[in-house]
């Protein structure tokens, strides 16, 4: 059901009230680096390497050709990723709920079979030759390493993390980066999700990925988890925010989070598209 524009405006205001509260978003800065430092790459290589690593890329392009330049980099990077058994789990454009929103423009979620595979790619001569296109294209980026949340991440029949299904032309995929207020904050947020996930299911949505943060490779914020949720439409998500049952759980969300970054997106890569 489509909401009238006046109602959407009211809901949008409520969305910012319920989703913001005492939490803060990290917007891109052109002063930030766009390449991982050697120290951060070494730290990644020192982590246990007994499963896949999933990289979240948030992208802001330079004006006047930045997106095209990054596309030239991406064409080579995708070949390198696939050569090592990795894949693009999801690619999408950041979509404002009623108009311009975050200054981040695109999100790409990439799965590598191991940390060694990612580090090997970062030293490949062919990949290194593509990096000037990345530099030419990006004004800012966030690159963060995650691993599947044991017992919480939906796996395919092979026990692997699946690509994200397209889920319909109107689907919204909401990225939630979460940092908790310690263990008590995590418990409060779990109460919030226990209340909210059934409401999402009633709308025809679902949690798609739940990942545990390992370390930033580019960017300074520390994140505990990434929660990636599909809604069948923008209206479904905004309508849920007005549900009294949803509102009942929002104090636990505010109590649980020390920081968050919320990005609504529309799919451009992944699944059936």
Give the ranges of each region predicted by the language model.
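Hydrophobic membrane-insertion alpha-helices, especially the h-region
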Residues: 9-17
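Short S/T/G/P-rich N-terminal loop/turn motif that feeds into the first structured element of a domain
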Residues: 16-107, 113-123, 127, 137-248, ...
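Bacterial N-terminal signal peptides that target proteins for export
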Residues: 1-10
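Flexible, disordered linker segments and immediate boundary regions flanking tandem C2H2 zinc-finger modules
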Residues: 131-134, 250-251
